[in-house]
Design a protein with these regions (language model features):
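Glycine-rich helix-loop "coupling/hinge" segments at transmembrane-helix boundaries
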Residues: 143, 154-157, 184-185, 233-277, ...
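C-terminal transmembrane helix and the adjacent membrane-cytosol boundary/short C-terminal tail
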Residues: 172, 218-228, 267-310
Length: 310
């Protein structure tokens, strides 16, 4: 291949992949009426509803979530739509206020995981060599531990609090971003237009940002959504075990921990927090799985081909 042809091909393909956000969003809009698109919109709608519920908690909650408003274990009915827990607190009010903690931890933990795992995956996959081997060894060592168990150990070391729990969960999911991004980068860097850009002496940073990153960008929202769903369950598990938040802060996992032993006498105090954990987790999973079908059509076709051949 002549240098001029290589330069032209790299430039043309660079323009094609140079705007990942716009291309991904346009592709999503085209597929928004498909089955996968409908699933994504359902998930987004549920997540947005929970976000607005958390933001408007001071106006939506009928009672103070930490105030005793009736006799303990009063069943649902009348002014107490979801009943009263064993502490005499309104379950509905604690559900509404308790949405704030999972959402805050999702935002912080997934952002930290993305901010660390993405550049490490790009660097490891593109540079290779000794750096790649070291990073893979470290990430595989972290990934080998069960997520909740590792989060428990980290939370026990660094202590309670929203930020500390977010950091503990973030550390658990950094290897997920790293592994997926690294594998994609290892494939993309072998493409002719990337090799042409390198042969022309283009700086590595520019090659990564202009040619490599746009081609792995479709994986980011998928990983982000799935990890967000996992973060909800991990946060609930930590607070259930008493490793999450200080007492007195409304939280769905803490409410389950507080009331589960009295399930037969006041099932509502455990059922409704668990139900909202299930709803939020399912909604985020809908978003992740739907985006995976929309943004990774080659993977979908490959899976279909493998199924047919089997």
């Amino acid at each position: 291949m002549a240098v001029g042809d290589a330069r032209g091909r790299a430039t043309i393909l660079g323009r094609f992949v140079g705007r990942p956000a716009g291309r991904l969003f346009a592709h999503f809009l085209r597929e928004s009426k498909s089955a996968a698109g409908i699933i994504v919109w359902i998930g987004i709608g549920i997540v947005l509803a929970i976000i607005f519920m958390a933001i408007l908690a001071p106006f939506l909650a009928p009672f103070d979530p930490n105030t005793k408003v009736a006799n303990p274990e009063t069943p649902p009915g009348g002014a107490f739509v979801m009943g009263i827990d064993r502490s005499g607190q309104d379950v509905l009010s604690r559900i509404i206020w308790g949405a704030r903690i999972p959402l805050a931890i999702i935002a912080v933990a997934t952002t930290i995981s993305l901010a660390i795992g993405l550049p490490m995956g790009l660097l490891s996959g593109f540079v290779g060599g000794r750096l790649d081997r070291i990073l893979v060894l470290v990430m595989d060592s972290i990934y080998a531990f069960p997520g909740l168990l590792l989060a428990i150990v980290i939370a026990a070391i660094i202590g309670r609090g929203v930020l500390n729990i977010s950091v503990a969960i973030a550390i658990v999911y950094i290897p997920t971003y790293f592994r997926v991004i690294r594998n994609h980068v290892s494939q993309v860097k072998q493409e002719p237009y990337v090799e042409a850009a390198i042969a022309l002496g283009m700086p590595r940073r520019r090659v990564i940002m202009r040619y490599v990153l746009p081609n792995v960008a479709q994986s980011i929202p998928v990983i982000f959504s799935v990890n967000a769903a996992d973060s909800v369950l991990t946060e609930a598990g930590l607070t259930f075990l008493g490793l999450g938040l200080p007492p007195g802060i409304p939280d769905w996992g803490f409410d389950i921990s507080l009331n589960w032993q009295r399930f037969e006498a006041s099932w509502w105090a455990t059922f409704y927090p668990g139900l909202f954990i299930l709803i939020l987790t399912t909604a985020l999973t809908f978003v992740g799985e739907g985006l995976n079908d929309i943004l990774n059509p080659l993977l979908r076709k490959r899976d279909l081909k493998a199924t047919v051949e089997a």
